[in-house]
């Protein structure tokens, strides 16, 4: 069982997007594609926290993920009546013919996958001529509690907090061959965050659970102590702004 299978049941509870945000992202994605009824593949679809909006609207959408548990969670969602088209496969070896899709969507996949060049090569291969490759991510307030605790956790683990270095490299790689690129912010929202909530999310996070169990326990205990000293209580709540960014790359050739 992969770490993503292990956390599939709780993934949406900790990382769901607001309904309005998912709907706004869908509108932005469809608005960026020239085809009237575009065929879209969502690579790293996970539990469908974004894909449900496409499925509910009856779009020509395919969700792909390596984790069987995540796809089962997607299929079991209560906010979709239609059966989603889901495929379990490695993103670096997509089971689709060349030029199969008008749009390819990649949302926060680089942190959980080695070999991003192979991923992008496959994404380009299945993209039709004139198609659009899209990179999406949720961005937290850099001064908010989540960002502060993430930086502290990185320091406790002896890491340099550069969470987007693979994504940045991927963006530069795509920009070098794309005929055009642009960035959109289709959704902004406010969310309540607490130190305790951050600890709960990270205790069940797929990336964090790849670390040795003893190291995870030690890091969370130290982070908990730091948070109490920094914020007074683990249940103190803060309101912060979040946004969804979408970077679009258009390719004259597939």
Region locations from a protein language model:
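Class I SAM-dependent methyltransferase SAM/SAH-binding core
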Residues: 39-93
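Short alpha-helix
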Residues: 162-177
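A short acidic, Gly/Pro-enriched loop at the edge of an enzyme's catalytic core
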Residues: 92-103
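A short glycine-rich, Lys/Arg-flanked "PGG" loop and its adjoining helix->strand segment in the class I
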Residues: 117-129
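Conserved Class I S-adenosyl-L-methionine
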Residues: 47-49, 176-254
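Conserved class I S-adenosyl-L-methionine
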Residues: 1-35, 49, 53, 70-73, 132-163, ...
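A short SAM/SAH-binding and catalytic strip from SAM-dependent methyltransferases
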Residues: 103-115
């Amino acid at each position: 069982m992969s770490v993503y299978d292990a956390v599939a049941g709780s993934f949406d509870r900790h990382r769901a997007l607001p309904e309005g945000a998912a709907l706004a992202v869908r509108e932005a994605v469809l608005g960026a594609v020239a085809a009237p009824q575009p065929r879209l593949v969502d690579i790293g679809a996970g539990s469908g926290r974004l894909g449900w909006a496409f499925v509910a609207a009856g779009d020509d959408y395919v969700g792909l993920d390596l984790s069987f548990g995540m796809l089962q969670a997607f299929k079991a969602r209560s906010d979709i009546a239609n059966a989603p088209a889901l495929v379990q496969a490695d993103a670096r070896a997509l089971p689709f013919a060349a030029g199969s899709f008008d749009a390819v969507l990649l949302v926060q996949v680089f942190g959980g996958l080695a070999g991003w060049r192979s991923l992008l090569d496959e994404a380009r291969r299945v993209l039709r001529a004139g198609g659009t490759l899209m990179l999406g991510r949720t961005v937290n307030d850099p001064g908010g509690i989540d960002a502060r605790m993430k930086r502290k956790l990185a320091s406790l683990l002896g890491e340099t907090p550069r969470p987007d270095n693979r994504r940045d490299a991927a963006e530069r790689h795509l920009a070098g061959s794309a005929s055009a690129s642009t960035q959109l912010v289709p959704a902004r929202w406010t969310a309540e965050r607490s130190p305790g909530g951050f600890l709960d999310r990270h205790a069940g996070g797929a990336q964090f659970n790849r670390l040795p169990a003893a190291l995870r326990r030690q890091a969370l205990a130290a982070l908990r102590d730091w948070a109490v000293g920094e914020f007074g209580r683990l249940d103190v709540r803060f309101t912060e702004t979040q946004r969804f960014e979408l970077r679009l790359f258009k390719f004259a050739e597939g």
